[in-house]
Amino acid sequence: MRDEDLVVMGFVRGAFGIKGWVKIHADTEYADGLFDYPTWWLGKNGSWKPYAFENGAVQPKALAAKLEGVDDRDAAEALRGTQIAIPRSELPEAGDGEYYWADLIGLSVVNQQGETLGKVDSLLETGANDVLVVKGGDGQQRLIPFVDQYVLEVVPAEGRILVDWGLDY
């Protein structure tokens, strides 16, 4: 499976117990949203391998999942840090004005004055709204709330996001 055919939805945090379960961090709207997909693609650095999802549980501090072929703690621990992706073709279409985080990461962020603030490095979920983590070429990091007041236009096809945000913020 090619990188462009997959959408990263989370990552494996480590082993959970001794029977091959893994702790996961999901970047989905609903914490257990990954449990809806029968096959997960796990990988690092563009090398992906499919795993059949067998079972899942919502734990107080993490999600836990059992994947086919991962049968002991050592096998689960070996997956620590791998990304979890789902084929784009299996995901629902994003609604108008909605975006998958994976589609925003790497986009250039430009303000109304035409100044480049940097590229989207990641996003944060705060509860009230999502926040763009923008890293500039100068190493400066900016946190821009992903709300209409500040994010004026998102154009993935052009690789950019237009914001109402100053260089000095």
UniProtKB/Swiss-Prot annotation:
Subunit info? Binds ribosomal protein uS19.
Q: Which GO BP terms, alphabetically? A: ribosomal small subunit biogenesis; rRNA processing
Task: Write the gene name.
Answer: rimM
The keyword RNA-binding is assigned to this record? no
User: Which family does the record claim for this protein?
Assistant: Belongs to the RimM family.
Q: Which UniProt keywords apply?
A: Chaperone, Cytoplasm, Ribosome biogenesis, rRNA processing
Question: What is the top-level taxon of the source organism?
Answer: Bacteria
Q: Where is each PRC barrel domain found?
A: 96-169
Q: Which Gene3D superfamilies match?
A: PRC-barrel domain, RimM
Organism listed in the record: Chromobacterium violaceum (strain ATCC 12472 / DSM 30191 / JCM 1249 / CCUG 213 / NBRC 12614 / NCIMB 9131 / NCTC 9757 / MK)
Where is it chiefly localized?
cytoplasm
> Does the entry annotate any disulfide bonds, and if so which pairs?
none
Location comes to:
Cytoplasm
Q: Provide the Gene Ontology terms for cellular component.
A: cytoplasm; ribosome
Could you identify this protein by its name?
Answer: Ribosome maturation factor RimM
Q: Which NCBIfam families match?
A: 16S_RimM
Q: What is known of its domains?
A: The PRC barrel domain binds ribosomal protein uS19.
Q: What does this protein do?
A: An accessory protein needed during the final step in the assembly of 30S ribosomal subunit, possibly for assembly of the head region. Essential for efficient processing of 16S rRNA. May be needed both before and after RbfA during the maturation of 16S rRNA. It has affinity for free ribosomal 30S subunits but not for 70S ribosomes.
Please list the GO terms describing molecular function.
Answer: ribosome binding
